[in-house]
A protein has these predicted regions:
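Charge-dense, helix-prone N-terminal extensions
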Residues: 1-120
Length: 120
């Protein structure tokens, strides 16, 4: 899978602003991230914050790739209506809602998944 639309954010609020402006327009993006300690010369957002912000807008993380310079790129895309939700992501959505971070787009994606689970 080719890395297209690679985005660099210094902090979570920059990613959130991008998602606010693009969650209903873009088909995907790749976000520079890290899973352990990030060197100071590579400002990036921690993986968990990338995942949480994606969920807030009804998006999901998928493929993780290492960039040539050693950094990581996480692919994000809008969640498909009938996609499977892990219990971990459902718990995260409830926590994000409690913290006042969920958007209407994120709520709709989450409620759609809850409806499917209850129907099965």
């Amino acid at each position: 899978m080719e890395i297209v639309n690679l985005l660099h954010f210094k902090n979570r609020s920059e990613l959130r602003q991008w998602l606010e402006e693009n969650h209903d327009k873009e088909k995907c993006c790749w976000v520079v991230t890290y899973r352990s300690k990030c060197p100071p010369e590579w400002p990036a957002i921690p993986y968990i914050e990338v995942v949480e912000e994606a969920l807030c807008f009804g998006w999901i993380d998928s493929t993780l790739k290492r960039l040539p310079d050693g950094r990581l790129a996480q692919r994000l895309s809008p969640r498909r209506p009938k996609s499977h939700w892990t219990q971990l992501n459902m718990d995260r959505c409830e926590d994000l809602e409690d913290r006042g971070l969920m958007t209407e787009a994120g709520r709709q994606a989450f409620e759609s998944s809850c409806k499917q689970v209850s129907e099965n």
